[in-house]
Amino acid sequence: MKLTKIVGLMGAFSSLALASGLNTNTNQSAAYLRNVARYATTEADAPYYNPAGTAFMTDGFHISLNSQAFWQSRNTYTESPLFGGEKKFRGKAQIPAMPSAMVTWHRGNLALSGYFGITGGGGALNYKDGFPSFDVAVAQIPGMLTQNGLETTDHEADISLTGTSYIFGFALGASYRIVDFASIYLGARFNYAYNHYEGELKNIKVNPKNEILGLDGSMVEAASTFNNIADYLAGKAGEAAGAAEQYAAAAEKYAAAGDKASAAQSKAAAEQYGAQAEELMVKSKTLEAVAAQVSDRELDVEQTGYGITPIAALAINYKRLSFGLRFEYNTSIEMENDTKVNQVGIDNYNDGVKSDNDIPASIYAGLTYSLLDNLRLSLGYGHWFDSKANLPGKQEKYADDTDEFLYGVEVDFLTRWTLSGGVQVTRYNLSDEYLSEMSIILDNTTFGFGLAFRATDWLKFNLGYFHSLYKDWEEDVEYGKNTYKRESRGVGVGIDLDI
């Protein structure tokens, strides 16, 4: 029984990042959902994807307002004799609204731009039925009791975990066209990080059967039952200790009277009762400890921190070719606990404790080429230097940087309509030590498609759909085998204004 250690795994809740890096959301606009390869764009969402490209916009204000909704599942299928086969543990996340706003002011060769968005995380991940390691720990109780002479065949418990993670980003910067076809950008993003972990392990019940103890095989509350049995054993230990003292006193009297045979018999009885008392007390203390382990436990911890990301970018816009390059420096974020309840005995969750939660440095490159006036092809690449960052729990030693590859196509038709689609391939390059039932970060391929409609010369609507398919991962564990599966889908709507 290592329930406190298991509850401590809550710290492994990874970012709820929806696209790309371990701690980064690159899905910042509805236009991105319909065409993921946007690192060379010069449209209204350029302040995030290609900030240097804002220098090639027309004079005036350019605004992009977006909202996205996502649905995720992170499921674990556990094969174990403890469950009599396979058991499914469901994790679900629903993000009803993920807003973002981007603004550019352009005049001459200069552009000032900024954006707000949820640049990491994005919602709450809920495990209503807990995790395999939680359930396995409870499932081991019947076997443990049976081995110690208390026949038990079943168990049940109320287990729930919820992890919430957000990184809110506010960025400002300026781009300048240094020559007709090239521009540079310098800026920074302020990041405010927020995590909230809530966990409950309650109402653990078992069905022990023992006539002497008055247990008939019905479900009973484990902690109170173990405490009652511990008290019963302690009482019996006291009786045995009392008998040992009486026989020891009798042995002394017989010895003083010269009755060696009776003295020897009394001494042997005293030793026997003394050993019995010691054994019963050990069992009583053990059950007290087990009762404490299976008693109701709660965890309620909020973590907050902030950091600043320096950003530099370059853009080239030459005839039918657009190119964008962006570098974001490593962002050091130190999270501090605000603990409401910590009944799990893990010091890392104590109030005021600090931990690392860096946003790794990253580099992005994009290329868009217009084959025809109404047909554009795009390519993109992103790289996150995960192994160089300070990640939660020193996980960087199990990470070998993330790579993403993006492909997109857009076709204009009927004057005001645009049809687009794209593919994003993400490879996290993580070792097995990084991955766990609470850190299901899996390589994936994402498909996005959608439409844009330019209602007027200054108003455009974007609609996109995003669907990620993840590679399954299997892990051999001491109690059997876990298979991890994940799926994500989302929709986005946006309005672009050119004033």
Residue ranges and their predicted role:
Residues 12, 56-58, 370:
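A generic structural signal for short, non-catalytic loop/turn and secondary-structure boundary residues
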Residues 40-49, 55-127, 134:
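Outer-membrane beta-barrel translocator/receptor signature
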Residues 20-37, 42, 98-100, 106-499:
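Outer-membrane beta-barrel porins/channels
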Residues 1-19:
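Gram-negative bacterial Sec-dependent N-terminal signal peptides
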